[in-house]
Amino acid sequence: DLLARSGKVRLFGQDAAVLDRDAVAMARRRIGVVHQDCAFLDHLTIAENIALPLTVSDRASEAAQNLPELLNWVGLSRQAEQLPPQLSGGERQRAALARAVIMSPDVIIADEPTGNVDWEMSQRLMRLLSELNKMGKTILIATHDLNMIRAMKTDVSARVLRLRDGQLMQAGAEL
């Protein structure tokens, strides 16, 4: 457990320090995470990897309904039956994004979502995140890429926080 040294963390309007196990589980279902180096199960197809969160939560029928549209949205329909090692870095990042949003979360946390991809794929991923934001999703992005931040500010970001060694250095729209 991490304990706050100062301030409070509120999670969907509730003090995170006093949430019980059920409330934490409910909050986790409302958050999707796109990891920088997303781990996939190499023996499952990309479609199976993306659907995994629904499958383990007894929502497999929902996965069967939503998966084709989601694969099309991220541009992976043709790669659905491939195994993870067969994908390029950009395809893996799009699969990670699809897996993060398959549960229809309210918040998407993306850790360096464009860190391992070329410029063109970076732009494509940013467009996908922008589309999610326009659907009412909150997008939190952790990145070292100032160019990405500048590009996102005009499309998605309402607020940018600059941190150094865990300390807030700057907050606002100007960077």
Q: In which residue ranges do the predicted regions lie?
A:
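Conserved signature/switch motifs of ABC ATPase nucleotide-binding domains
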Residues: 82-85, 103, 135
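ABC ATPase NBD coupling module
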Residues: 16-32, 132
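Conserved ABC ATPase signature
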Residues: 83-87, 91-93
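Conserved ABC transporter NBD signature motif
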Residues: 7-15
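Catalytic Walker B motif of ABC-type/P-loop ATPase nucleotide-binding domains
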Residues: 108-111
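Hydrophobic anchor residue at the start of the ABC signature
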Residues: 97
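Short coil-to-helix segment of the ABC ATPase nucleotide-binding domain corresponding to the Q-loop/switch region
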Residues: 44-51
